[in-house]
């Protein structure tokens, strides 16, 4: 019997660092294979899935800006880094016989389709895995904001935020403060008021304004994406 997901359509947000593993840089083949297997498992259920991958394992626009680069140029470099991650994930998924499409906000027709909202929705309706890359196509906006915007555009039920170094949202950094408390449930306004570093304030405000729930969980535990899709209580749930 096919397992039933809680959600019809989800957006999975992965940090670039999640693909790097312990080295913190580049793409770890073992990690990306594990992520692809988890995504493929969800795709076989009755759930449509879109993925957004950051580029921090290759380049961070803010880092370049802090070093004196033009912020716009640095951010565009970061967008290109997300395309590299997206293509690597697409390749891993296709090796698992998953029909996958990469849609980019910056046109590069030789390697991916340009992002068109209706096309993205159509791919999802056809049960294809969609990977959004190159951010929203504009500098100064993070991939967290991309996840929020794309989730609203494709009418996703939830954003699943897979983290590589934490299993939910805590009152403080659990690696630094042993008294940090893990939250099972939060509201968007709490997250903003308490300055909890789940996503940047632009993305948080957008999710709150558009009533988009988030589940924050560890991507490093095998099977957690499936558990999140099935609505199991893992990580932290954030709602309006």
Swiss-Prot record:
Residue numbers binding ATP: 13-16, 56, 60, 164, 170, 173
Organism superkingdom: Bacteria
CDD domains noted in UniProt: AAK_UMPK-PyrH-Ec (cd04254)
Pathway entry: Pyrimidine metabolism; CTP biosynthesis via de novo pathway; UDP from UMP (UMPK route): step 1/1
Regulation of protein activity: Allosterically activated by GTP. Inhibited by UTP.
Residues reported in the UniProt entry to bind UMP: 55, 75, 136-143
GO molecular function terms attached to this record: ATP binding; UMP kinase activity
A Gene Ontology biological process term: 'de novo' CTP biosynthetic process
Complex and partners: Homohexamer.
NCBIfam families, A to Z: pyrH_bact (TIGR02075)
HAMAP family: PyrH_B (MF_01220_B)
Function recorded in the entry: Catalyzes the reversible phosphorylation of UMP to UDP.
Family (UniProt): Belongs to the UMP kinase family.
Name assigned to this protein: Uridylate kinase
Protein's organism: Staphylococcus aureus (strain Newman)
Organism ancestry: Bacteria, Bacillati, Bacillota, Bacilli, Bacillales
